[in-house]
Amino acid sequence: KIAKYELFGHAVSENGASVEEPMNISIIVTDQNDHKPKFTQDVFRGSVLEGVLPGTSVMQVTATDEDDAINTYNGVVAYSILSQEPKDPHDLMFTVHRSTGAISVISSGLDRERVPEYTLTIQATDMDGDGSSTTATAIVEILDA
């Protein structure tokens, strides 16, 4: 919980006389990656019109990590999609921005009559994608155009 200690020290001889000027000593505590990312919700819900073009934004997912994200990568969260159900008409209909968690359409062919809803399993991984991870669900409703 304490990131830095500031000490004030000086050297003295055996008889107590100063032999050096007083100096500040800083001790910086390095964060240990001891927390997993946590999504702000277990289930995220969003919607998008059928037939939209690739690149259309759908929603955003958010995860936080209690570890230090300023001096280390321990608290830097990277997002990815682990799975999409159903895999129709393509197994990759959506993408998630690695650093922001913004989910957008990546393929054409969204059709409400064919597939009214998609379920995505989203993963958040700390250490900028190389550490501990956790998952949440994103449900995308396809709206009639």
From Swiss-Prot:
Residues listed as glycosylation sites in the UniProt record: N24
Location of the protein in the cell: Cell membrane
Family matches, as Pfam families: Cadherin
Location of the Cadherin domain: 1-39, 40-145
Membrane topology, record value: Single-pass type I membrane protein
Quaternary structure note: Interacts with CDCP1 and CTNNB1.
Official protein name in the record: Cadherin-3
Organism of this sequence: Sus scrofa (Pig)
